[in-house]
């Protein structure tokens, strides 16, 4: 059996929330989280494959620091995303662990395994062409793995968010 390529260090933890602003306030007040940076009022993901079918969806997204870890808050703005599915089925909570990977295709194949685990999302970010995917391996782990392609574009895009943890 060939060992899968080792994932790099954790990039962020993603939480699905009902209200991005309220979640930021609560995390700041209860846990000293922050500062937070918003990705805007609406991030619209176009031409994304969700469960293998083309769709689009919108989210409100904010990044912040919590105990030295970068966190992502995701508020679904419609019912077409895996985030909305998660919220309806499980309520607010930890949705995914994310990794920036230089060898996207190789890592995606390794994380999916054999037989391949469900590919919840396969797409690119809004207006930036950074490849990303959600893999749901199921089983006892119960948390989705997000892979984001490490590239000069993703480094420039995610740099300000990564700096939140260094403050």
For the regions a protein language model found, what residue spans apply to each?
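Long, hydrophobic N-terminal alpha-helical segment
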Residues: 2-50
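Solvent-exposed, non-transmembrane amphipathic alpha-helical segments
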Residues: 47, 56, 93, 155, ...
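Vicinal oxygen chelate
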Residues: 1-6, 15, 17-25, 29-35, 66-69, 72, 77-82, 109-167, ...
């Amino acid at each position: 059996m060939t060992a899968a390529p080792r994932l790099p260090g954790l990039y962020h933890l993603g939480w699905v929330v009902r209200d991005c602003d309220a979640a930021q306030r609560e995390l700041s007040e209860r846990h000293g989280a922050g500062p937070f940076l918003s990705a805007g009022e609406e991030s619209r993901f176009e031409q994304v494959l969700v469960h293998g079918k083309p769709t689009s969806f919108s989210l409100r997204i904010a990044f912040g620091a919590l105990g030295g870890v970068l966190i992502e808050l995701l508020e679904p703005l419609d019912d077409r995303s895996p985030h909305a599915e998660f919220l309806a089925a499980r309520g607010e909570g930890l949705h995914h662990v994310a990794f920036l990977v230089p060898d996207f295709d190789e890592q995606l194949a390794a994380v999916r395994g054999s037989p391949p685990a469900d590919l919840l999302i396969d797409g690119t970010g809004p207006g930036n062409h950074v490849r990303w995917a959600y893999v749901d391996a199921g089983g006892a782990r119960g948390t989705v793995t997000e892979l984001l392609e490490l590239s000069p574009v993703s480094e420039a895009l995610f740099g300000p968010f990564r700096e939140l943890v260094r403050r």
